């Protein structure tokens, strides 16, 4: 897991963008694909971004923040995805996210439509709601199935080529599906209280931390072994965390 540092949330920059987001929020319930509410891009500071807010009833700012972080920590591809920065006081964090649309490797004809999207997504937690902003969105694909190319979301959306336009729709659907899944997770989750934020920011572990805090600091362990009231989490041969009755009692490194 990449080191976590203080994050500056990337806000909407102008009143017209706030208006665009609000109008989109009112209209998006009419824009549904495969049961997913679609969040559409708009221009902000010369690039296409996707930003909106989602209401989450009966959830505190702290719970939404911790649940959101845990959602990504437990699902990341650790080779390419990570939490870039966070600020526990403000309830904000930024992730580096990769979406892949890959066809059957045996279907060579379909391979030409394979695409990978890299982006950053900033989140801001508040009582009963979460705001997100996806930006720096870039698609990587092969032109004619051979030559590697890249295009940002603005180019995809404005292109006359059906292939590139289809890529923009793929990204919008994948990102919207992620937000839907995240919100459903937050609604059902009952997160543990997190207090060791400075230790987490240093990617360290100390006695007294709970499992959620250790995951936020180190990620998911390679193996877990339970014996009575003791749980042993092995991150490597040189890094082992032992819990007794749910709290860290020993660190071997």
Per-region residue spans from a language model:
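Bacterial Sec-dependent N-terminal signal peptides
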Residues: 1-19
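Ser/Thr-rich, low-complexity intrinsically disordered terminal regions
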Residues: 15-192
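Residues within mature, well-folded domains
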Residues: 191-253
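A generic structural signal for short, solvent-exposed coil/turn residues
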Residues: 6, 46, 87, 113, ...
